[in-house]
Amino acid sequence: FDFSQPLQNKITNINFTDETNKDENGHGTCIIKLIDSISSGLELYSIKILDRTGKGKLSSLKVALLEALNSDVNIINLSLGIEAFIKDSELEILLDKCLSQGIIIVTSESNNGKINYLSCNNRIISVQGKQNNLVTSNNVIYINNSPRIIPWLGSSYVLSGANSFLTPFIIKKIYELLQNHVSIQNLKKCLMQQSFIFNSNKKIQRQSIINAKLMKSIEEEISIWNLYDENKAFKIAQATPRNITALVRIIEEKTQQSYIYDSFWMPDLAYLENFVNKIGSILH
């Protein structure tokens, strides 16, 4: 985790790698900031088992699961995948202990189409971004209209649709369900319901502009970054961290509030009209 980042919740840092606690990848910092934004009054554990390249040892995962058990956590976020398919009895015992104690485990599917060993356990909640022609599984929760703008190292932001960064979105839904007294046994069923699938699977539509004055103001301010073409369509190739961070500054300036991580997804960015209308909706 990048400890220069402000958090609203208490965090305990534990490191099971051969590297320092410093996050040089960005992955861990992003996940923690997304989970931290869910609510105040939470107690977070940042257990580092992946190195700067995003790789880790199975032995580190086992020790981390044991640490989570001993720390009496409620939810374990595993934004990682295991591509080996030889059954590991020690890992299975640890996972079973966690699940039997009522700990909710959330993981993500592979970004390259490979099967995640963890998601083969039907008691573990797995999430994946919905894409065209994707072969779906009844054991996976799909979220449409990814990517979205998410926090990164330092005070920067990126546009990403990686599955890892969808787990906090599901954990937020789990938190809300638990607050509404939904039982752990019924959590997955509720999450699978269409009402919890983010947005629709329809083609993104260009909206009609609502506030022409706001449109003109924003268009002038963002023209320097070349994020939209002459038809006001979003240019994904220009979505560099620098440009996305600048876009967040515009959002914060216009709305007079800190950027909310669940607020700007691809449908809100696809056309300049959509972007302006989304800012306008926050202003109202």
Annotate each language-model stretch with its function.
Residues 192-284:
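Phosphopantetheine-dependent thiolation modules in NRPS/PKS and related acyl-activating systems
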